[in-house]
């Protein structure tokens, strides 16, 4: 869960995974700053095992002499448990662009999984006691989120200064927005599930939740999300 903006979100805190490679064919003592994605690990593993990479695979063998570093990498988040969301992002060497498809929903939406964690409980308690600072209130407890977020890595390591409305970066924002839109079409991104599918999935998950308190929290949360679906929120 990290500090509430990590797991299940598309900031670096939730997506950046250090990669260390050791073995035959791996150069020793070399550091690289390439942009790579999880899907590249499958291609890399096949190549390391001497298996031909299928042409239909999007992943790349990053140790190949023919490897061309990517200009952009992409990430996505949808429903996690009963917490229905739709977030997409694209990252370049210098910038991170995030699009929230449900900006009317709060950042820390109700989640039986997350709300059971001590860090989230403590943060919610501190906020209720008015002991959280302005930045925390803005990033975690705002009732709505920006539709678009843009962050400059070298000057904003933790992605707290949204530049999406800064005219200075309008060209960058437009470029990344177009690249994300192209990726969504190219990959056939289906978007969020329908309300009917949400109901079927969450009812199945709720029935397998053993703890009575957790099951009741899950039920209350899913009822709220169903209302949001119907309200177009």
What are these regions (language model features)?
Residues 1, 104-105, 159:
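Acidic catalytic loop of the alpha/beta-hydrolase fold
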């Amino acid at each position: 869960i990290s500090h509430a903006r990590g797991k299940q979100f598309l900031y670096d805190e939730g997506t950046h995974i250090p990669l260390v490679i050791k073995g035959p064919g791996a150069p020793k003592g070399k550091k690289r700053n390439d942009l790579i994605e999880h899907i590249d690990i499958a291609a890399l593993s096949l190549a390391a095992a001497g298996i031909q990479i299928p042409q239909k695979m999007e992943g790349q063998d990053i140790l190949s002499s023919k490897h061309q570093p990517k200009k952009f990498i992409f990430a996505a988040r949808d429903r996690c448990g009963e917490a229905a969301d739709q977030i997409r992002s694209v990252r370049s060497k210098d910038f991170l662009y995030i699009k929230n498809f449900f900006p009317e929903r709060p950042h820390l939406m109700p989640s039986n999984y997350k709300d059971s964690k001590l860090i989230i409980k403590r943060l919610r308690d501190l906020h209720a006691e008015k002991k959280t600072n302005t930045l925390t209130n803005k990033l975690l407890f705002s009732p709505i989120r920006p539709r678009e977020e843009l962050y400059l890595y070298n000057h904003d390591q933790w992605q707290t200064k949204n530049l999406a409305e800064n005219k200075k970066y309008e060209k960058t924002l437009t470029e990344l927005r177009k690249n994300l839109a192209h990726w969504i079409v190219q990959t056939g991104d289906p978007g969020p599930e329908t309300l009917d599918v949400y109901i079927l999935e969450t009812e199945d998950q709720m029935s397998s939740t053993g703890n009575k308190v957790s099951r009741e929290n899950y039920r209350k949360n899913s009822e709220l999300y169903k209302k949001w679906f119907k309200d177009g929120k």
